[in-house]
Each structure stands twice: as structure tokens, then as C-alpha cells.
Amino acid sequence: MFKTLYARIAIYSITVILFSALISFVLTNVYYHYNLKASNDAKIMKTLKEARQYEQSAKPTHIQQYFKHLGQMNYQIMTIDQKGHKTFYGEPFREDTLSQNAINNVLNNQDYHGIKDKPFALFVTGFFDNVTDNTVGINFKTKDGSIAVFMRPDIGETFSEFRTFLAVLLMLLLFISISLVIASTYSIIRPVKKLKLATERLIDGDFETPIKQTRKDEIGTLQYHFNKMRESLGQVDQMRQHFVQNVSHEIKTPLTHIHHLLSELQQTSDKTLRQQYINDIYTITTQLSGLTTELLLLSELDNHQHLLFDDKIQVNQLIKDIIRHEQFAADEKSLIILADLESINFLGNQRLLHQALSNLLINAIKYTDVGGAIDIALQHSHNNIIFTISNDGSPISPQAEARLFERFYKVSKHDNSNGLGLAITKSIIELHHGTIQFTQSNEYVTTFTITLPNNSL
């Protein structure tokens, strides 16, 4: 029954309606018991005493006819003579519950207030309890002696039409309330069901079909965020497919080249050519090894929760070590590396920061013309650490500049790199809560600027 949200909301709402009706009935009964019962008793007692006064002044010939006439006026009456004989007038009582002690007291001229003294019952309204002890009683003097007269209004007869009206009203109230609860519950559940179907489509890989935002409440907000999530997942899926295609291409091309070189190696007996083929195969396998290393590093950066950033790094010394390591490559192109480094300490991951800065210097050496210069600077600026590396090189188009930090992107098709270096650098800098920017001047000087928070204070 409670397996669906629709049934749960509907049953909860109906239960609330019925429980509210029950509580309302109990509270009404309590209100009658403590506020209305005494005044109701007094009104009926007043009516009965007026009837006795009329009987004593008018002296009707047949007292029974007089009580019968009162019974026809929607009163229930019970008379008891000295011998204990009981006579009923009007509609019959549901049950005779009057005690003999109460009867004797009335015969001895004591008034009886059974309505006022009726004990409280939680689920029984005293006003409607049609029993003989729920009456008022007084002594009547007749020519045949004293009689005890007990009377209460005939609620059933007096309010018969009202009871019918009330019953119809309550039935309609419950029917309409329950119908509206079911309808309103359906209006709430319908967009949730559509959201469920959209989620199932999402699981099946459909990232293109949006759901219509039909409301402005919390469900509408949920629909809006679902569409945003769908778009994000679609982008992630496209990136995944693009990544797989790029990796496949980066691996397939060198493997095809190796296969071709091995075929040539088998068919030639020329020692010079054989050595050249072996050297080419070695170069390609080295590139594949580098690609594998960088892919593993990218995976590590994407799942960085286990990484620690608490190494105390002397950044200026780190840069000097990188320059010394890459000096041979710079000397091969007769490049001059100028470094202006302030003494700066930084708290981070030394291995990753070394990789990021090395990538930038390797790129600068690679794309600087022979005999050119590379300028490196490290300095404080307010609460930040600023690292810049500039070099002379060929200009980069605005289209290429916009995609410079994308994974597997290459500025030139003839570039023998795998296009991951700058993407790795950007990820590392962002994990250190920093930023990296690329600019170029009219003189074809390209500059990478890294800004890191000065966290060594």
C-alpha cells in the first residue's frame, strides 16, 4: 500500500481528515460537558416547572392527556406514581437507566438534575444520550396524589431534518475532501513520475531530452536542477567520448608506425636502415611511455582526494633545480634562460608543482626560436605568489589560444607532443587554489602567468 508516494500522501491526508474530525468531535463533547450542559439542564427544568404551574392553575380534567400533549410537542416524558407505576409519553426512551433513589427523591419534593449531573463520556455526547437518567425531574401534585415527572427534549424528533441535513453535509464534506486530496496528490505526483521516467532515460544514456519545467515551487526547482544535471552529464559524456577517441588515436598512430617499422626491419638487411628503424621504434615507445605516465597523472589529479598538500616548498630553489635539469635541452638550441627569483616558501605538493613548472619550461624551450631567450620571474605581490615565464616564438591564433589548456589539444598538427602538458599544469595549479593565464604581445612574446596564494605566512 505504501510502496508509492501517491498512496502514501493520499492515505496520510485522508488519515489527517478523519483524525481531525474525531478530535473535533471529542473537543465539541468536552465543550458541551463543561460549558453547555448546566444551562441546558436549567432550560429544560424551567420548561418543566412552567408546565407544572400551568397544570396547577388550569387543573386539566385528565392529567394523562396533558402529558400526552406535551409528548406531542417533542418532549419525552416518564411519570411514576406512588406505587412505582411508570407511564411514558412521546417517543420512547432508548433505555430506562433511572435509579430508584432518584425517583424517591423526586417523590419527596426534591428536584432531579440528571442532565447537569450526567457523567462525562469521551465518545458519547450527553445532549443526544436518549436514556431516562439524562432528564430533569420534579414532583407534580395531582388529585390522585404526588407523581414524579421526568422530562427531556426529543432531540431525534426536534432535529430530525437537521440531522439529515448534517449527515448529508458530513458525507459530502468527506467525499469532496477525499476527492480533492486524491486529485491534489495526483497533481503533485505527476511531475515526480515524469521526473522518474526522465531519470530512467538518463540511465539509458539519453542526455538530449529535457523535462518541461511546469511549476514554480520546490518540484519546479527540482525540474530545473534536473535539466542542469542532464546538461552537465551530457557534457561529461561528450568529454568522455572525446577523451577515449583522443587516447585511442594517440595510441593507435604510434602502434601503427611501430608495426610498419617492424615490417621494414624484417625485410631489410641493410645495417644502417635496421639501426635507424630500431632508433625510431625506441623513440616511439618512449613517447608511448610518456603518454601512459601523463594519463596516469591525469587520473590521479581527477581523483585527488588522497593527495596531500603539506610539503614545505622553497619555490625559488625548486625553479633552479628545474632549470638545471632542462639546461642541456636549452643549450642544444643556444637559448638563454634569465631567472629573477625572490626567495619564497610555499605549502603544497612538491612533486606536482615540480611537474607543472617543468611542463612550462619544456614548452618554452620547445617553441622558442634558436638563439632566443626565456625569461623567468618569481615574486611576491600582496598576498599572492606570481610566477611568469616568457619566450619568443611563433604567434598563436585566438582560436588556438582559447583551447590551449584542453586535453589532447595541439596547436599544430605537426606537433609530436600528446597535448596533455598544459592541461596537467592547469589542473595542478587549480588544486593549489591558484590560476594560470596565457598572454602574447605584438612582438610575439608569449607569457604564462601563475598566481598562487601566499600560504606560507
UniProtKB/Swiss-Prot annotation:
Bilayer-spanning residue ranges: 9-29, 164-184
Alphabetized UniProt keyword annotations: ATP-binding, Cell membrane, Kinase, Membrane, Nucleotide-binding, Phosphoprotein, Transferase, Transmembrane, Transmembrane helix, Two-component regulatory system, Virulence
Enzyme Commission code(s) on record: 2.7.13.3
Reaction(s) the record says it catalyses: ATP + protein L-histidine = ADP + protein N-phospho-L-histidine
Molecular functions per Gene Ontology: ATP binding; phosphorelay response regulator activity; phosphorelay sensor kinase activity; protein kinase activator activity
Membrane topology (UniProt): Multi-pass membrane protein
Histidine kinase domain segment(s): 246-456
Coarse class of the protein's main subcellular location: membrane
Pfam assignment, any one: HisKA
PTM per Swiss-Prot/TrEMBL: Autophosphorylated.
Entries under InterPro entries matching the protein: Bact_Sensor_His_Kinase, HAMP_dom, HATPase_C_sf, His_kinase_dom, HisK_dim/P_dom, HisK_dim/P_sf, Sig_transdc_His_kin-like_C
Any single Gene Ontology cellular-component annotation: plasma membrane
Subcellular location: Cell membrane
Sequence positions bearing Phosphohistidine: H249
Summary of the function given for this chain in its UniProt record: Member of the two-component regulatory system HssS/HssR involved in intracellular heme homeostasis and tempering of staphylococcal virulence. HssS functions as a heme sensor histidine kinase which is autophosphorylated at a histidine residue and transfers its phosphate group to an aspartate residue of HssR. HssR/HssS activates the expression of hrtAB, an efflux pump, in response to extracellular heme, hemin, hemoglobin or blood.
Record-given protein name: Heme sensor protein HssS
Organism the protein comes from: Staphylococcus aureus (strain NCTC 8325 / PS 47)
